[in-house]
Amino acid sequence: MLQKRLFYLDNLKVCLTVLVIFHHAGQAYGDGGGWAYHPSNPAEVMPWIWHFFSTNAAFFMGLYFLISGYFVPKSFDKQGAGTFVKKKLIRLGIPWLLMGGLLSVLAGKLETGHMWFVENLLFFSLVYAGIRLFCKPLLSCTSKPTIIGLFIVGALMGVGSYFIRQESPQDHWIFWMGLIFEPAHYLQYVMMFFLGILACRFEWLEKMENRIGAIALLIGIVLAIGNYARDGGEWNAFVYRWFGIYESLMCVFISFGLLWLFREYGNWSSRFWQWCAAQSYGAYIFHMILMLLLQYATDTIWMRAFGKFMFIGTAITIASFVLTWLVRMIPGVKKVL
């Protein structure tokens, strides 16, 4: 029996892809860190946008990993180890090598950029396949998401992240044995991927009660507002000190809250949303190059920082999805994108 298409997960991934694009669009006009482009006009800056970056980084890639992990068990069960690994190497390995190679050539050094996600998702999938060769799949059980359960998961993630950040602070990236990763967030990504696997096996997304989903979303929103409210003072000092824990709780509650919200109110299946879902993976892959080209091309055009941010984000969102659609018309490309 064919599994019913979960349109709400497709739609949520589309929204996450757009959020990633806007996140990167803003980096040049805030604290871009290692961003490849910096405006020549020093007035093009948005000091407040670090709140946007901080809140996004708390959950959006973790939620990506959870959704990706959700589809892994049934894909492995259906295809078997050999086909599963082969398809992952094609769909994840080829874009990682090609885009990573292009970014490295442009940067003049080894550089994977945003492809770190694809690289690590491939690694997680291969580890899962290796484990399944020796272990039987997890059996179903009657458990379902609860607020206390979500809090415990967030707290465990947070305590671990807190201690990791004592040695490796946020935005410190490491290249190790072919993998590039940020230790400060890595525990979150591993746990969220594993939660996705459990959510599939135990049918947590289907079992999550409306009351639990709504409360989780409300808690996540309150934590996000608290993060945006940081502006010096005791509250900022408190959140900054315990941010590994604060961020992890925000990640878990926002993620499960959004999963509930889209399950109940975002299960659209129009042709437009199905088209967007089909292009979202490629849009993630292509958007970085397109964005840098447009940022350099519009460097001397004055729109104010917020205007540039919105223009770049909107234009590259459209361009990335359209470019993916065109590239996927090439025979054989749909197996990759």
Where are the regions that the model predicts?
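Alpha-helical transmembrane segments and their immediate juxtamembrane cytosolic regions
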Residues: M1-L337
